[in-house]
Amino acid sequence: MRVKILPLVFMTLLLIVPSQMLLPSGQANASTPGFIERVYTDKARYEPGELVTVTAQINNSGGTNWSGDVTMTIFHLENAVYSSVQHASIASGQTTDVTFSWTSDTTDFKGYFVSVDAGSLGQGYSSIDVSSDFAKYPRYGYISEFSSNETAAESAAKVNELAQDYKINAWQFYDWMWRHETMIKRTGGTIDPTWIDLFNRQISWPTINNQIAAIHNQNGAAMAYAMIYAARENYSGFGVNPEWGMYMDPAHTKQLDVDFGNNSTYMYLFDPANAGWQQFIHEQYLDAIQTANFDGIHIDQMGQRNNIYDYSGNSIDLATRFTPFIKAAKTKLTAANSNQDFMTFNIVDGTVNGWAANDVSKNANVDFLYSEIWHLSNSYMQLKDYIDSLRANSGNKAVVLAAYMNYGENIGDRYEAEDAALQHTAVNTDHAGYTGSGFVDQFADVNDSVTFTITAPEEGYYSLVFRFANHSGYTATRNLYVDSNFEIELPFQNQPNWDTWSHETWHQVYLTPGTHTIKLSYDSSNTGAINLDSLTLGTFDEHSIRLADAMMAASGATHIELGEDSQMLAHEYYPNRSKSMRSTLKSAMKDHYNFITAYENLLFDADVIDNDAGKQFINIAGVNTSPDGAANTVWHMSKRTPEYNILHLINLVNNDQNWRNSGNQPTAQTNLATKVYIGAEETITGVYAASPDHNQGATQSLPFTTGTDSSGSYISFTVPSLEYWSMIYMKRSTAAPVDNMYEAETAIKSNVSVNTNHAGYTGSGFVDQFATVNDGVSFIVHASSKDDYVLRFRYSNGGSDANRDVFLNGKYAGTVQLKHTGGWNQWAYGELTVPLAQGSHSVVLWYNSSNSGAVNLDHLKLDKTYIWQFDRQIASVPAGYRITFKAGLPGWVHFGTDNWKNVMDIPLASNGSSDSSLNYEASIGPFPSATTVDVTFLWDDNNNGILEDMIDRWEGTDFQIAIP
């Protein structure tokens, strides 16, 4: 959360028609006498084995009655798992609900695609999430309006719309509370029916309860927004002690606060690590859950703060104080009710290694990760890298991003003020920065007015955004009229000078299609002078949003963006409705959320891992591709699960590399002849394509061929079309090679060749000409279990010492040393130890600009290992495992067996680690059962690389490792 000081009247909403109107999610087919308007399920999420009800709303707009079979088919990925037929009769001009039931599978955490076929009346689609825990796949929405005028039926309707049409399964209740330190207002121990919040909005307690009940009817989760460290003005009267506070000076004369600019409203900040504050505010969290029946707490904060102190004058490192607070809060909530202890925390301004990001994502016991993105991760690739880091840090917890699309842009149909109907005003050009041919001046007296005539292309919400200047020294006001009806008095805040233009005054209305008049008038109650530049119908840009949502989902994250009344987040203050969605974007969002629900297992599961992003894996004929979201390219993103290889194609052609700003319609791609290189040990048995942009996400089987060329083994297929985002998933089996030995000559090769002119190689040859920048060999390996493994690269080197960088699943894993072996016919191993989850992984040995030397590469051997470190000494290792020693100094591992028999020395080689205590390693073994390994170390303090046992320093301690 960023706090922005906004007068309440900036955030206004006019409801002219019922807000629960639902738009069709189906697609009409002009060649048929009707269409399926929508297909939806009765809940947002289902428990394993729970009964699922699917409803298809079918319209018969033809001139005759229709009678026929309606078929529902449920798919898990490419496989149909259930089918049912209902006979229906629909009178001409009528819409009928056809209902199906299915008892969900007892397997937890699975997504399903639902297809309904009504023959000549068309097809419709939906999805089903079978998950016992929403936090596994959080599709997070929000509620920010709690009006006392909202009935229980209206509360249910707006919740049901988000659950049924957009598959939202959790809701953040934004700014629902009375005060930040006293969330529920009571008088004499009784809860008040309403209260006034921080921004002077009325909050209705019955409405909050109705909304939570509606969410629970959808099997959704209601999360109470709360700050981690905030209390309002006069907090002492509510039981808060100033000694718990954070201060700007050691003498605690100035407490950290947020001033809301009206000389009466403040938010004061408190130390999250202070035990008194924790005890107090955790009780408030518990009260919110137990009294309102929330399911958990959404904890917010306001970003980086430096040079702060506690009451006693001690300097505070705020970034390290969130995790202890979260752990204590979680413990308290769990002790009270483990079914209502969900928790997430906002990592503000998220970026790789950003402020507080690593500590919270690694150590805080939140149920899913949540991060508000500002300006440290502006590009697609920066954001993907950040998502990757959060998932890696947390053991693949779910990630939700608060990323405000088109932030700060004044976009949509624009009407220039100088072209409007003017009364008692003038047009001028004497202040720079206006749009059009000028601006309206002398808008300063009673009876002055500007009347715009606008066109609404469709029925729906429209955001009226006024661009103005005001340097009169105070806030000016004008009355707004829509179609001659008074709506509201709007403020126009004072600006630094008359050349500063603002578009932060807005008002949202619901309009019918056609022409409307929008009038700003200086009436007798108004004050101040303004210059008026334009009126914009603030509108979200569909192209950038579809691309950004595609990128986030393909990277393994979801996006909080949808709220009540089909609103989308325009701002960090959620009630801000300065932009609206048009129907085409709403339809695209329905398809997107249906897609990410149906295919959640290929997008968000913990065993979905990155493949290397290098171009050596993908070739699309005649298409400019990139592995990193470069501007004007088709971005290819490869992933894999234990059963599938996955290729995401995101169409950035005609767009730049940044996700937030408005964009362009991507240049459509058709018939993409695609070649995907695979490991020699992989077998592909099916290729499938699915996209939210086509057939509302239905899977299509693609014909494919297999082959081998100079680069390696591949499959080839044609992707019929690419609009924004297509996902190709390939069913795969893997046969691990004998002794886990992966031959280099059959791997994926980049700018190298295969040769047999030096004896001693294994397999059918070795990789030659591995000698210049961007040469590489890429392996796909299979780990039989989750373990540490030594990557053992067998090579020969008849020249100078060499090294190569190693990339594991697309991330730098270290550098392997490939020293001179004494000749090209003499082979040795260079090693690097890495952790591997069970399943397939990409291992790339690459010549980067920082590397040197020429080598021949024979094979990669994958050996399980245990790691011995001075701070983590192990006493035993299973038979068959190697032992990797890691240290922070060069030297040798001096070892023998069974009381120092068969003594050997193995050099500790630099591994490229950034950890200076673990940046050298060597492995030994494996050893048979009933063996004792004796180990010590000889340190090369003079760093000459020569073992000098009378000169180099001995460790002085012997260590024993048992092999049971």
From Swiss-Prot:
Quick check: keyword Repeat in the entry? Answer: yes
**Which domain of life does the UniProt lineage start with?**
Bacteria
List the InterPro entries: CARDB, CBM6, Galactose-bd-like_sf, Glyco_hydro_66, Glyco_hydro_b, Glycosyl_Hydrolase_31, Ig-like_fold
Q: Which residues form the signal peptide?
A: 1-30
Catalytic activity as recorded in UniProt: cyclizes part of a (1->6)-alpha-D-glucan chain by formation of a (1->6)-alpha-D-glucosidic bond
Q: Pfam families, per this entry?
A: CARDB (PF07705), CBM_35 (PF16990), CBM_6 (PF03422), Glyco_hydro_66 (PF13199)
Q: Does the keyword DNA damage apply?
A: no
Keyword line: Glycosyltransferase, Repeat, Signal, Transferase
Q: What is its EC number?
A: 2.4.1.248
Q: Which residues form the CBM6 domain?
A: 413-538, 740-863
Q: What class of enzyme is it?
A: transferase
Q: Which GO terms describe its molecular function?
A: carbohydrate binding; glycosyltransferase activity
Q: Which family does it belong to?
A: Belongs to the glycosyl hydrolase 66 family.
Biological function: Produces cycloisomaltooligosaccharide from dextran.
The name on file for this protein is Cycloisomaltooligosaccharide glucanotransferase
What organism does the record attribute this protein to? Niallia circulans
What gene is this protein a product of?
cit
